[in-house]
Amino acid sequence: MAAPGCSPVGIDKSAFVVRLPRVALRIPKQKSHRVASLLSKYLLDMPRVKHIVEDPQDPSMRLLLFSEAIAQPDLEGVSEEKILAVKEIVPLDVVQHEVVLDYSYWPVEHILKEILPAGCEVPSSFETIGHIAHLNLREDLLTYKKIIAEVILDKNPKLKTVVNKVGTITNEFRVPEFEILAGEPSLVTEIKQHGATFRLDYGMVYWNSRLEGEHKRLFAQFKPGQVIVDMFAGIGPFAIPAAQQGCAVYANDLNPTSVKFLKLNSDINKVGESIKAFNLDAREFMRKLVTEEEGCVGEIASSTLIAENSLNGTRIPSSKENSSSLTEGSDMPSSKKPEERKAKKAKVSEVVKMKISDVKPWEHFDHVVMNLPASALEFLDVLNGLLCKGRWKGTMPRVHCYCFMRSNETNADIVKKAETYLGGSIADPDVYVVRDVAPNKASLAFTAVVSWFISRSFIWSLYFFCLIQAHLVLDSIEHR
């Protein structure tokens, strides 16, 4: 059985037409605003409905629409003082007018509430990624998924595609599987964050618009001239802004499609010479980075501009074709004025860009970003014994690691886990709750400085292991 207001072939838009009879005052166009100011407290006050409209019988005349409280032709309810003041300007010409509210007037929530069966919770929000709306529909709404998607497209002209997440994330690249519910099939899109432009294939790479605030919080800690190591870089939400503010960035991701878009985004944002991209397992990436012979193996991103705005045969919309600018989890364009955007762009252009070719990562880097909450803690073990004190110069790096925390866990539990993987204690960790991702689950970030004790602990462990083995061998020889 179809839900009210919809049918197997789509939405019955005529079911949403509402006609409201209203009393109106007919006056000449040039005097309409003067009279309206006198009667303002009595006029129609509805969202997105004008209280001054053109007279359909005479374009030179206007109708002042009264509120529902003024329902009689004698304008009962309007003070005598106001009526006399109006008569001094224009003669009273009271008429009837019908306000028509059709499908286009009603917001998404109202339409869906009318369409969906009683008891169904109306989807109240969705994530927007460029021209794509990302839904997470519960099972009881899946029967109506196509209708829901159609309404969202109708009501958001900047959107072109609506998708729904299917199942849980099981692939090695942590990319959700999506079903396209309505609109264009292409998931290649473009978004803007903090003055940077990002292109991506939403069906092939990971992106979360709700993390915009966290991206800003972290890269605000980077200073011009610093060297950043991003172990799980994705398409560059940390790497690109860091390079824009004068950092050199070593960026790695296991997903080859993410790395391709990372390189493309480096070129789009003119920071290619400041970023070196790798497509490796994160542990292998870190070990290569601190080996002098291997530290230059990655590709400088500026050499990878993809011809004709295409990637793997998929056409990528240009910034002019798709210029949706996002706020965190929002589907609204940026409210910044052109002058503000130009000023911000000029400020970015003034920053002296670091050339990655001038950096020796085996000697120093300042920050390590580990943004893979599902398993980043496990990768902390690569830092155990990683750095060579004979070659390292300057201060030890700060590690920014993301993870999940269950409701029955504490910050101390997370730090203890981290210490287990690191192989040593963490002094003064800075723990920060990023956001709640589920009723009993939160995303957490902690920052700590790697100590030389941790850097050397693996070497000392190996040293003592060899001593013990040598002792056992000698002991066995003595007893022969």
Curated annotation (Swiss-Prot):
It catalyses: guanosine(37) in tRNA + S-adenosyl-L-methionine = N(1)-methylguanosine(37) in tRNA + S-adenosyl-L-homocysteine + H(+). Its main location: mitochondrion. PROSITE patterns: SAM_MT_TRM5_TYW2. Coiled coil: none annotated. Pfam families: TRM5-TYW2_MTfase (PF02475), TYW2_N_2 (PF25133). Residues 334-346 have a biased composition (Basic and acidic residues). Residues 312-328 have a biased composition (Polar residues). GO terms for biological process: tRNA N1-guanine methylation. Residues 312-346 are annotated as: Disordered. The keyword Ribonucleoprotein does not apply. S-adenosyl-L-methionine binds at residues 215, 253-254, 281-282, 371. It is an enzyme of class 2 (transferase). It is found in: Mitochondrion matrix; Nucleus; Cytoplasm. One of its GO terms (molecular function) is tRNA (guanine(37)-N1)-methyltransferase activity. Its EC number is 2.1.1.228. It comes from the Eukaryota. Specifically methylates the N1 position of guanosine-37 in various cytoplasmic and mitochondrial tRNAs. Methylation is not dependent on the nature of the nucleoside 5' of the target nucleoside. This is the first step in the biosynthesis of wybutosine (yW), a modified base adjacent to the anticodon of tRNAs and required for accurate decoding. Belongs to the class I-like SAM-binding methyltransferase superfamily. TRM5/TYW2 family. HAMAP family: TRM5 (MF_03152). Monomer. This is tRNA (guanine(37)-N(1))-methyltransferase. It comes from Physcomitrium patens.
